[in-house]
Amino acid sequence: VSDAVNSAIPVNPFCHVLFDQPVIPGNTGNTIRQCAGTGAALHLAGPLGFNFDDKHVKRAGLDYHDLASVTLHENRDAALAELADEGGHRVFAFTAHADTWFTDITYEPGDVLLFGTEPTGLEQEALDDPRVTQQVRIPMLPGRRSMNLANAAAVATYEAWRQAGFPGAV
């Protein structure tokens, strides 16, 4: 299911945020709002752990749903087929196990920021996918397992947007 045509949504987003099998509706709702505010496109790879019409998704996204580009994909493979295979975009897989910090990357228009499900992160199969350009991490203090999905996506998206010069921002 692709998003409807809306003149408020950028035709060529500066980056694509891809959630693989998200399970917490509030995180997806928050990220819809964040993507609406930055011009990034959100892609959700199923199966989703919630109904997309869930009241928590709607509440977290407030009235930004019509201002965001959101595309639902059957699974991660279908999403990567569209974005990486057909679109030719680079894919950065965010994982706590990578050595490279996400700020060490020079982002390019159309890059894909790939995040795993909330309880476990990206599966090894996703990390090993040949379409993944590089695995990257958001630095944290020692002994911390992970960040909240919506927060991690926001941190990464704003870095990519900053590097792009905040196109369209006021």
Model regions: which residues?
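Post-transcriptional modification and biogenesis factors for structured RNAs
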Residues: 1-170
